[in-house]
Each structure stands twice: as C-alpha cells, then as structure tokens.
C-alpha cells in the first residue's frame, strides 16, 4: 500500500506478474522484479514493439548526449554495465536468474528487440548484455585474479607486486588496485568475474589498514555468494610487532563468502627471501 501522502487522491491500479494493459493498439505486460534492485522494481514489456522497460536491470551509470548503444563502443558499455551489476545488482543475482528463466518460459525473452533501462544507454542490440547478465548472475569467471592492497611504508606494496608477478607467471590475467588511488567500486567490478583475489594491508592498531577494512565491508555487502561463484583469496600483510590484520581479514572474508587458501604475515620490510615466497604464493593462487 502506498504510504506517501501525495498518492492519496490518485486512482491507482496495482499490477503484478501476468497482468496486461491495453493502451490503445499497444499492450503492456508486467513482470515483478523485486530487489533488482528495489523492492518495488518491475519489468514492463511493450509487446507489439518488443521493448523491455527493465527498470534498473541492464543499466549503466553513464549519462551521454546520445541515447542508444549503437552510438558508443559495445565494449565500453558492457564494462559500464558490469560496474553497475557488480556494485548494485550482485546481491539480487538469485532473483535475476529466476527472472531470466521466467522471461524464457513465458516466451518474452525471444521477443525482446530493445531494452530501455532507467540508467544509461538504450540497448537496440540486447543480445550481448543479456548474455553477460546471465554469466554474471551465475558466477561465470575469467582466468583472472584481482589484487587489492594498501600500504603504509611500501612493505605491503612490495608484496603486492611480487604476488602479481607470480600470478602472471602462470599466464593468468591480473587487475591491480591501490586503494589510495582507486575506488572500491572499480575493484568490485573486476572481482565480479575474477576467480580469486589477493588482498593486502599493513596492520594498524591490530586491525587492517582502514581502506582495506572498508573494501572488505563492501565485499560483504555485495555478496558474491549469491552468484554461486566460489572465489579463493590470498591475504598478505606487513606488521611491526603483534600483527592482527591477517586474522581480522580472514574472518571477514570468510564471512563474505571467500575461501582463504593462504596468508602472508611479514615482519617489517620483506627481504629477497620473503619476496620470492610472495611470488610463489601468487603463482600457487593462479594455479
């Protein structure tokens, strides 16, 4: 029931999945899409023209002077769609899988000629983004690992670079994020289709450095578990005495659905032997 006071004098017709409205030569068909990504989200299909008004699904956080996907690079738009999905839709992945199946079962999916989301470009060729949504919602990953780190006096940074080198030595793609320069939203975008992460932070007051603590908070919020993806994690850290960052990160990452396969907890500045160990741990994560 609508609670907002301005609705009180309006004539409202509630609609749900399966309802249709004839608007004069055109038929609107409704499909409830709760939590994609609002509780009241709904798809509306304009049957005669094959247009799916998808609300938030299939959107991108871009605002361009032109309206259609054909005006821009498909690779650019799919990357923006991935960023939107990773940060806003991942939590609703089980619902999205259900809705894609529902659109298939009722014959609407094969009739879609255009998708008009609330945000970003209109898809005149919806095939690529529908395919990507199916992959993202099902936890399909590339042979890719995302490395995320912060550093205080460059010790953790040295570990990060050696781990990345080890990963690449196995022919696996690496995306690297330094949290003093990069945002968590960009890192989460790449984590969506990564098979694993390596995450590092120096210890500060027996806890991870704050930006990495914030990063792990967001990983728990978006909930990659919902995609069915089983992502491994390598944790690395430097410390001055007692440590504590690794233990905290391990607890929080496991709660967020990651499988922690290995850790490094280094005292002060890593020497050549420790850096060689970091390289091997990166290679092992890639394998």
Model-derived features with residue positions:
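Short, glycine/acidic-enriched loop or turn micro-motifs at the edges of active sites
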Residues: 59, 122, 153
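FMN-binding flavodoxin-like domain, especially the glycine-rich phosphate-binding loop
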Residues: 56, 64-68, 74-115, 119-122, ...
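Conserved hydrophobic helix-helix packing surfaces used for dimerization/oligomerization
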Residues: 28, 51, 145-147, 233
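Glycine-rich phosphate/diphosphate-binding loop of Rossmann-like nucleotide-binding domains
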Residues: 156
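Short beta-strand/turn micro-motifs composed of small residues
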Residues: 149-151, 237
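Catalytic core of the metallo-beta-lactamase
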Residues: 5-71
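Terminal amphipathic helices with adjacent charged low-complexity linkers/tails
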Residues: 119-145
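Anionic-ligand anchoring segments at beta-strand to alpha-helix junctions in alpha/beta enzyme folds, i.e.
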Residues: 1-2
């Amino acid at each position: 029931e609508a609670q907002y006071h301005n609705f009180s004098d309006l004539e409202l017709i509630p609609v749900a999945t399966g309802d249709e409205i004839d608007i004069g030569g055109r038929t609107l068909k409704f499909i409830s899409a709760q939590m994609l990504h609002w509780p009241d989200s709904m798809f509306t299909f304009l049957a005669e023209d094959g247009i799916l008004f998808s609300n938030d699904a299939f959107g991108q956080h871009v605002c361009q002077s032109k309206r259609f996907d054909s005006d821009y690079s498909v690779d650019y738009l799919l990357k923006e769609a991935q960023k939107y999905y990773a940060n806003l839709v991942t939590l609703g992945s089980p619902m999205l899988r259900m809705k894609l199946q529902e659109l298939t079962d009722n014959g609407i999916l094969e009739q879609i000629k255009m998708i008009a989301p609330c945000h970003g470009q209109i898809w005149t060729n919806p095939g690529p983004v529908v395919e990507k949504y199916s992959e993202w919602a099902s936890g399909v990953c590339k042979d890719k690992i995302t490395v995320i780190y912060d550093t205080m006096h460059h010790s953790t940074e040295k570990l990060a670079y050696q781990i990345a080198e080890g990963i690449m030595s196995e022919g696996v793609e690496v995306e690297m994020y330094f949290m003093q320069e990069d945002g968590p939203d960009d890192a989460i975008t790449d984590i969506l289709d990564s098979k694993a992460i390596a995450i590092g932070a120096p210890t500060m007051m027996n806890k991870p450095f704050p930006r990495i603590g914030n990063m792990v908070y967001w990983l728990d919020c978006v909930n990659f578990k919902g995609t069915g993806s089983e992502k491994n994690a390598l944790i690395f850290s430097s410390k001055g005495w007692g440590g504590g960052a690794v233990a905290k990160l391990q607890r929080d990452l496991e709660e967020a659905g990651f499988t922690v396969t290995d850790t490094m907890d280094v005292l002060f500045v890593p020497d050549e032997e420790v850096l060689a160990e970091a390289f091997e741990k990166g290679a092992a994560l890639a394998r």
